[in-house]
Curated annotation (Swiss-Prot):
<dbReference type="Pfam" id="PF00067">
    <property type="entry name" value="p450"/>
</dbReference>
<dbReference type="InterPro" id="IPR017972">
    <property type="entry name" value="Cyt_P450_CS"/>
</dbReference>
<comment type="similarity">
    <text>Belongs to the cytochrome P450 family.</text>
</comment>
<keyword id="KW-0408">Iron</keyword>
<dbReference type="InterPro" id="IPR001128">
    <property type="entry name" value="Cyt_P450"/>
</dbReference>
<keyword id="KW-0503">Monooxygenase</keyword>
<dbReference type="InterPro" id="IPR036396">
    <property type="entry name" value="Cyt_P450_sf"/>
</dbReference>
<dbReference type="GO" id="GO:0005506">
    <property type="term" value="F:iron ion binding"/>
</dbReference>
<dbReference type="GO" id="GO:0020037">
    <property type="term" value="F:heme binding"/>
</dbReference>
<keyword id="KW-0349">Heme</keyword>
<keyword id="KW-0479">Metal-binding</keyword>
<feature type="binding site" description="axial binding residue">
    <location>
        <position position="409"/>
    </location>
    <ligand>
        <name>heme</name>
    </ligand>
</feature>
<dbReference type="InterPro" id="IPR050196">
    <property type="entry name" value="Cytochrome_P450_Monoox"/>
</dbReference>
<dbReference type="GO" id="GO:0016705">
    <property type="term" value="F:oxidoreductase activity, acting on paired donors, with incorporation or reduction of molecular oxygen"/>
</dbReference>
<dbReference type="GO" id="GO:0004497">
    <property type="term" value="F:monooxygenase activity"/>
</dbReference>
<protein>
    <recommendedName>
        <fullName>Putative cytochrome P450 132</fullName>
        <ecNumber>1.14.-.-</ecNumber>
    </recommendedName>
</protein>
<dbReference type="InterPro" id="IPR002401">
    <property type="entry name" value="Cyt_P450_E_grp-I"/>
</dbReference>
Length: 461
């Protein structure tokens, strides 16, 4: 297996952090990228620390990340951070490993290719247009809440060819509560504060329906409620088959229709939850940053007027909206929904002269990489032009909004298409400014979201 080349000069000695400090902050503060646990990982390309008896290495140089995600990918698997997700969504492309993951990923790769997704544009546009048409000009509202509703409707339409209607809000509330409970479970499991066997048993109990004490009962209720909702949709489709091009039909027919019912359920639930959560956050940050940068917004509005006017966009229009796409890419750099990923070393390795022992958890703080001035000059400035200039000397792992390597998010093309359509359709009718007195606060759970929403006023164009 490959190791990182040793002829390159070391990026610097490994930084070492206090075990007590890191353990305390993992428990009490959490994973906050500013003042909390991960904020301490700034300023070094590689940081070593222990937390509750487990070994960790944080890598912030794109060459190191490239090594883990590409060159030596067979030496690393997804870490325990995905255990709580497995409790709710089961075994799926996000939580699976090895040959099983490769087989299922291979069966779905072509489905998420751009040429296939073009057929879903109509299913995406209708719910976006409906939510936009219902907007009251001049009224103050929470854009994050609106994006949650919109993305859930888009994913439900593209996945199931139906609108969940009044269920949208309750499903989002369940997903939000679930993420927060999962983050608390992750602190206990990822940081080794309970034996892994106990941790795995708790996950099994949550999923199986065994009676649990109050701290875990809510997580269990969330899991079982979502399970019933998804299974009812699958039951209806099996009882009344359709010729729809939606993703549920793709899952039911994958590999000739031999996937177990439970696997179809797990994948469908994952696409719905992960697909709406990350995209809703990304769009919330997009509107927030556009409100703070009116020149970039005006440039986008001019592009939309020139390309679309007031007609609905089509799949052919997406490639013509270069500035709109660049604004979305820059907002994902500035506030990446997936702001950290982790891998566990299953074999000894060497990263640029630094030894990585088997069993070490390797943390990749995407948020820090996206704000490193070596790859992003003046990183705190919102500059969509970065993605039109495309410098050739920028390392490929300096930009990771969808992760990287062979496990890069399978839904990235779906998400980008959805985001461009939302930006275009909503901006044809409205401009959005921040509400007076609003101040953003970041909340870093398993995703990076605005803690108290993004409060804006929509003005008719």
């Amino acid at each position: 297996m490959a190791t990182a080349t040793t002829q390159r000069p070391l990026k610097g000695p490994a930084k070492r952090m206090s075990t007590w400090t890191m353990t305390r902050e993992a428990i009490t503060i959490g994973f906050d990228a500013g003042d909390g646990f991960l904020g301490r990982l700034r300023g070094s390309d590689i940081t070593r620390f222990r937390c509750a008896g487990r070994r960790f290495v944080s890598i912030s140089h794109p060459d190191y990340v490239d090594h883990v995600l590409h060159e030596a990918r067979l030496k690393y698997v997804k870490s325990d951070e995905y255990g709580p997700i497995r409790a709710t969504a089961g075994l799926n492309l996000l939580t699976d490993e090895g040959d099983s993951w490769a087989r299922h990923r291979g069966a779905l790769n072509s489905t998420f290719a751009r040429r296939h997704l073009r057929g879903l544009v109509g299913l995406m546009i209708d719910p976006i247009a409906d939510v936009t048409a219902a907007r009251v000009p001049g009224a103050q509202f929470d854009m994050h809440q609106s994006m949650v509703e919109t993305t859930l409707r888009v994913v439900a339409n593209a996945l199931f060819s139906q609108d969940f209607g009044p269920l949208v809000q309750s499903m989002h509330d369940l997903a939000t509560r679930g993420l927060r409970r999962a983050e608390k479970l992750e602190r206990l499991g990822l940081w080794g504060l309970m034996p892994r066997t106990v941790y795995d048993t708790l996950i099994w109990c949550i999923y199986s329906g065994v009676h649990l004490p109050p701290p875990l009962r809510e997580m269990q209720e969330i899991t079982l409620t979502l399970d019933r909702a998804i299974n009812s949709v699958i039951d209806r489709r099996l009882a009344e088959p359709t010729n729809s091009a939606d993703l549920l039909n793709v899952l039911l027919s994958a590999d000739g229709g031999i996937w177990p019912r439970q696997r179809v359920r797990d994948e469908a639930l994952t696409f719905m939850l992960a697909g709406h959560e990350t995209t809703a956050n990304a769009m919330s940050w997009f509107w927030y940053l556009m409100a703070l940068n009116p020149q970039a917004r005006d440039h986008m509005l001019t592009e939309l007027d020139d390309v679309l006017g007031m007609r609905r966009p089509t799949a052919d229009d997406l490639g013509k909206l270069a500035w709109t796409t660049a604004c979305l890419q820059e907002s994902q750099r500035y506030f990446s929904s997936v702001w950290i990923i982790a891998r566990e070393a299953v074999d000894d390795d060497i990263i640029d002269g630094h030894r990585i022992r088997r069993g070490t958890t390797v943390v990749i703080p995407i948020h820090h990489i996206h704000h490193d001035p070596r790859w992003w000059p003046d990183p705190d400035r919102f500059d969509p032009g970065r993605f039109l200039r495309c410098p050739t000397d920028r390392p490929r792992c300096a930009y990771l909004p969808f992760g990287g390597g062979r496990r890069i998010c399978i839904g990235q093309s779906f998400a980008l298409m959805e985001m461009v359509l939302m930006a275009a359709i909503m901006s044809q009718h409205f401009t959005f400014d921040l509400a007076p007195g609003y101040h953003v606060e970041l909340e870093a759970t398993l995703t990076l979201r605005p803690k108290h929403g993004v409060h804006v006023i929509g003005r008719r164009r």
